[in-house]
UniProtKB/Swiss-Prot annotation:
Pfam annotation, one family: ocr
Organism: Escherichia phage T7
Binding partners and assembly: Homodimer. Interacts with HsdM (AC P08957), the M subunit of host type I methyltransferase restriction enzyme M.EcoKI; 1 Ocr dimer binds to M.EcoKI. Interacts with HsdR (AC P08956), the R subunit of host type I bifunctional endonuclease and methyltransferase restriction enzyme R.EcoKI; 2 Ocr dimers binds to R.EcoKI. Interacts with host PglX/BrxX (AC P0DUF9); this interaction inhibits the enzymatic activity of PglX/BrxX through high-affinity binding. Forms a 2:2 tetrameric complex with phage T7 OCR.
Any one biological process term the GO annotation gives: symbiont-mediated suppression of host innate immune response
Domain of life of the native organism: Viruses
Protein name (record): Protein Ocr
Coiled coil: none
InterPro entries to which the protein is assigned, alphabetical: B-form_Ocr, Ocr
Keywords of this entry: Early protein, Host-virus interaction, Inhibition of host innate immune response by virus, Restriction-modification system evasion by virus, Viral immunoevasion
Function statement: Prevents both degradation and modification of T7 DNA by the host restriction-modification complex. Structural mimic of the phosphate backbone of B-form DNA that binds to and completely occupies the DNA-binding sites of all known families of the complex type I DNA restriction enzymes. Thereby, inhibits the restriction endonuclease activity and protects the phage genome as it penetrates into host cytoplasm. Inhibits host transcription by binding to the bacterial RNAP and competing with sigma factors. Inhibits the host exclusion defense system BREX.
Length: 117
């Protein structure tokens, strides 16, 4: 039986790359438009398999406690609670990097537009 080696950093890296792609694909040019892209990336990166969920929660980079207790789902299903916690941490961490990713994209767009002139 193979053990899951998924860490929070693996999940975050995947979400980060998805956010980067979302910014480019949706041609996001304003921080006000980042909300949907961040939540889409976080939602897609949250693991679904029990072993992966427990592995992520056991890894460094994520606390057990919710930052906003209002986000804790009203359920006794431990898996859903852990997934919600991973999702919350991903959105927090992605927001920290989102502006840098957006600025990087805007610089690329500006260079491309200057080259076309």
């Amino acid at each position: 039986m193979a053990m899951s080696n998924m860490t929070y950093n693996n999940v975050f890296d995947h979400a980060y790359e998805m956010l980067k792609e979302n910014i480019r694909y949706d041609d996001i040019r304003d921080t006000d438009d980042l909300h949907d892209a961040i939540h889409m990336a976080a939602d897609n990166a949250v693991p679904h398999y029990y072993a992966d969920i427990f592995s992520v929660m056991a890894s460094e980079g994520i606390d057990l406690e919710f930052e906003d207790s209002g986000l804790m789902p009203d359920t006794k299903d431990v898996i859903r609670i852990l997934q919600a916690r991973i999702y919350e941490q991903l959105t927090i961490d992605l927001w920290e990097d989102a502006e840098d990713l957006l600025n990087e994209y805007l610089e690329e767009v500006e260079e491309y537009e200057e080259d076309e002139e």
